[in-house]
Curated annotation (Swiss-Prot):
The gene is NAM-A1. This is NAC transcription factor NAM-A1. It comes from Triticum turgidum subsp. durum (Durum wheat). PANTHER family: NAC TRANSCRIPTION FACTOR 56 (PTHR31719), NAC TRANSCRIPTION FACTOR NAM-2 (PTHR31719:SF149). Transcription factor of the NAC family associated with the grain protein content (GPC). Accelerates senescence and increases nutrient remobilization from leaves to developing grains. The tetraploid cultivated wheat (T.durum) contains one additional gene coding for a functional protein (NAM-B2) and one extra pseudogene (NAM-B1). High grain protein content (GPC) is a desirable trait in breadmaking and pasta wheat varieties because of its positive effects on quality and nutritional value while Low GPC is a desirable trait for barley malt and beer production. GO terms for biological process: regulation of DNA-templated transcription; system development. The keyword Isomerase does not apply. The NAC domain includes a DNA-binding domain and a dimerization domain.
Length: 405
């Protein structure tokens, strides 16, 4: 008997523990929400499931909205008073009158005031029936916080959405008339306008400033990338010049080093000449065999699309110039660059021959003289007629060549 009574008593105690409500949560403690859940209710959900129940003193499903008198704090102090939220915060707050017998609410805060913006937005019940009259559940008002005293306050980015009820049945949240003043004293009048309103507080992000900051960051990154890449480019260029030796012709070398000018002109990489058995001695021999003067006028021709000189007769070939130290033999690809000691005096004529080679314009008058050297061989005398360009297949123009160093 004793064992059966003890077992039945323990079972009753366990049943009572199961039906007992959980202990009340301490104020300010964070609610126990499953991972991934966010508290972002709609306007209708805020009014129906939270504000109405709070006004009717019905227990809420979860303590997620704190009770704070918003007008006793500045908006930047409210996030630490909230129970839950990262970008927006929810509060139950009372509302007082501005004047004892008036209906206007008091919007003054610690260091500023809340100013209403726009018109009140009605919150209607959701309905799907055709022609169904939707019930008005509450009113939503938007307010902006200003620092200082009205009307010269400084506008901030802090926004408040205030929700209040419109149905007076079973609720004390709606605006109620002030109690009558007795004894001629206004101090006894109550300033309470609404017991509870629900407020959502957040700070608006200035999109224009955010966009300017992003563009400024991108511009700084681009400048840093350019500054970082330029030394690498310059170092790579110098390394390339050192690897090619004197045969590597960069624009700076062509402008500042006359001794390497002709070598850079004959470099296969810069001139783009096809492989062949051309040698500098053939060019010099062709120049010595020509009775033409050093400076010649070259007339433009319509038979060739390569008009390398200006159409006016002012285009004059540069004067011959000797290049000291050009007494070396070097092979560039299949093209031989050879010179001996007796070619030192003929270097100027070789330059003139190369000038004629680089400007294959046919002669239109008998007074003009022109020599075309194609792969080391001069053209036949009949090449000075209209078909002079038939043997020239790939004229090459060297960009960036300074003929008057």
């Amino acid at each position: 008997m004793g064992s059966s009574d003890s077992s039945s008593g323990s079972a009753q105690k366990a049943a009572r523990h199961q039906h007992e409500p959980p202990p009340p949560r301490q104020r300010g403690s964070a609610p126990e929400l499953p991972p991934g859940f966010r508290f972002h209710p709609t306007d209708e959900e805020l009014v129906v499931h939270y504000l109405k129940k709070k006004a009717a003193k019905v227990p809420l499903p979860v303590t997620i909205i704190a009770e704070v008198d918003l007008y006793k704090f500045d908006p930047w102090e409210l996030p630490e008073k909230a129970t839950f939220g990262e970008q927006e915060w929810y509060f139950f707050s009372p509302r007082d009158r501005k004047y004892p017998n008036g209906a206007r609410p008091n919007r003054a805060a610690t260091s500023g005031y809340w100013k209403a913006t726009g018109t009140d937005k009605p919150i209607l019940a959701s309905g799907t029936g055709c022609g169904l009259v939707r019930e008005k559940l509450g009113v939503k008002k938007a307010l902006v916080f200003y620092r200082g005293k009205p009307p010269k306050g400084l506008k901030t980015n802090w926004i408040m959405h205030e929700y209040r009820l419109t149905d007076v049945s079973g609720s004390t949240t709606t605006s109620r008339p002030p109690p009558p003043v007795t004894g001629g004293s206004r101090a006894a009048a109550s300033l309470r306008l609404d017991d509870w309103v629900l407020c959502r507080i957040y700070k608006k992000i200035n999109k224009a400033a955010a966009g300017d900051q992003q563009r400024s960051t991108e511009c700084e990154d681009s400048v840093e990338d350019a500054v970082t890449a330029y030394p690498l480019y310059a170092t790579a260029g110098m390394a390339g010049a050192g690897a090619h030796g004197s045969n590597y012709a960069s624009p700076s070398l062509l402008h500042h080093q006359d001794s390497h000018f002709l070598e850079g002109l004959f470099t296969a990489d810069d001139a783009g000449l096809s492989a062949g058995a051309t040698s500098l001695s053939h060019l010099a021999a062709a120049a010595r065999a020509s009775p033409a003067p050093t400076k010649q006028f070259l007339a433009p021709s319509s038979s060739t699309p390569f008009n390398w000189l200006d159409a006016s007769p002012a285009g004059i070939l540069p004067q011959a110039r000797n290049f000291p130290g050009f007494n070396r033999s070097r092979n560039v690809g299949n093209m031989s660059l050879s010179s001996t000691a007796d070619m030192a005096g003929a270097a100027g004529n070789a330059v003139n021959a190369m000038s004629a080679f680089m400007n294959p314009l046919p002669v239109q008058d008998g007074t003009y003289h022109q020599h075309h050297v194609i792969l080391g061989a001069p053209l036949a005398p009949e090449a000075t007629t209209g078909g002079a360009t038939s043997g020239f297949q790939h004229p090459v123009q060297v960009s960036g060549v300074n003929w008057n160093p």
